[in-house]
Amino acid sequence: MLQKSKILLLALCSLALTACDHIADDERLIEVKNSPQTPDEPETAVRTVLLEDFTGQRCVNCPKGTEVIEQLQEAYGDRLVAVGIHGGPLGFKGTAKAKGLATSVGDEYFSHWNLEYQPVGLIDRHGATNYTDWTAAVRQQMSQPSSIKMALTATLGNGQIAISVEEEPYADYSGKLQVWVLEDGITALQSMPDGTNNANYVHNHVLRTPVNGTWGQDITLSKGTKAEQSMTQAVDPEWNTEKLSVVAFVYNDSGVEQAVKAPVK
């Protein structure tokens, strides 16, 4: 009886192995990982968020906004581009003894967006946002894909910054390209939350000048066709060339679609 059981078991195993040999390649089960539910979904790029910080040296709460930005930069790294735009009623243009960081273009931006207080931010230009809400607003924007991938280089030579911007669109796009020069590590006066004035406050990502006009230049992109723009910016003698960077972003009435930042080398 035991011998018959062994023979039956061997026969069943042989049948199973033989059956497997007859499964066609196109009938085999294959594990598919991360298969998209919608194969025709358009390709997108990872979004880099632009935070325009409208600040001022006479603004006692603006250092609090800076602290939020530092926390966001630590959390998100290069995916957040912060720009300190000095101007408005609490901006300071300087005196013979004290360095000022406010600019006429900063004043123009402040007025254009109908801002009423400082610090206040624009997150991808989706309305004025109080600094206490920046973290949530940035997180929300980062969850949104972008239809454009951007690249940027900035090279210093002979007192000029040579700038090259490239866009790779995954959809047709019409809007504007804006390019700015920023400077880090500027030691200058700042009013503090405790009511004191700190003459040795270090200001970072300070907007120094727009490169291609106050509101940038028109840009039209066609899906699948890369575009590139080149421009130069003269270096102001007051700037520390070792602390300069360039920011480029594309925007339209729907907000900022993509941003990128690169150090000046």
Give the role of each language-model region.
Residues 84-265:
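Short, conserved sequence motifs used for protein processing/export or organelle targeting and
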Residues 36-38, 68-73, 109, 136-141:
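Intrinsically disordered, low-complexity boundary segments flanking structured domains
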Residues 32-33, 64, 71, 103, ...:
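Membrane engagement elements in two modes
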Residues 23-31, 60-66, 193-195:
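Short N-terminal helix-initiation segments at or just after the protein's N-terminus
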Residues 2-7, 15-50:
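Bacterial Sec-dependent N-terminal signal peptides
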